[in-house]
Amino acid sequence: RESLYVVNTYAQKYFTDTLYNSDEGKSIGLSYFKERGLSEEIIQRFQLGYAPEGRTVFTDRAIKEGYNLDYLVKAGVTIRVEGEEGKATMHYDRFAGRVMFPIHNITGRVIGFGGRALKKEAKAKYVNSPESEIYHKSKVLYGMPFARKAISTEDNCYLVEGYTDVTSMHQSGIENVVASS
């Protein structure tokens, strides 16, 4: 269980680092967030990021840095495709080429991700982490650790449609806002 938290924390840091320190991350991911009107403070508070293009860029890097492939798969950041008889098993990055929205539990630990494709030809606009030992979609609200105090103070909560709605509302100063994950 703890290993899944460790893998997700690594992935979040990797995606955030890619957003700020790669040409692809800056030109695609950071540009997208800036076009949405998000400030540096909001991008950093929500730990937003960018998953680079390439089928195995993230997974290869994680393995090279000592992360176990089985845990990458269990955490949902890597997809394993079993080869047919006589063919090799393959793996690839679940979120390649997407802006990344880490999903946090109530205490603020990263338990999953939502990734938004920016290319029109993408099969799915949003891809989310699969259910795992630490992430249960129906039990988690996106943005809750950042909204808790405001919900308590205001004694109400707005439920909005998606990740960008939550970050935009927080950007506007309305912080008692969450979305289903």
Annotate each predicted stretch with a short phrase:
Residues 36-49, 173-181:
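Short, well-structured beta-strand/strand-turn elements
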Residues 1-13, 52-181:
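Phosphate-handling DNA/RNA-contact segment within nucleic-acid enzymes
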Residues 1-44:
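Non-catalytic interaction/clamp surfaces of large macromolecular machines
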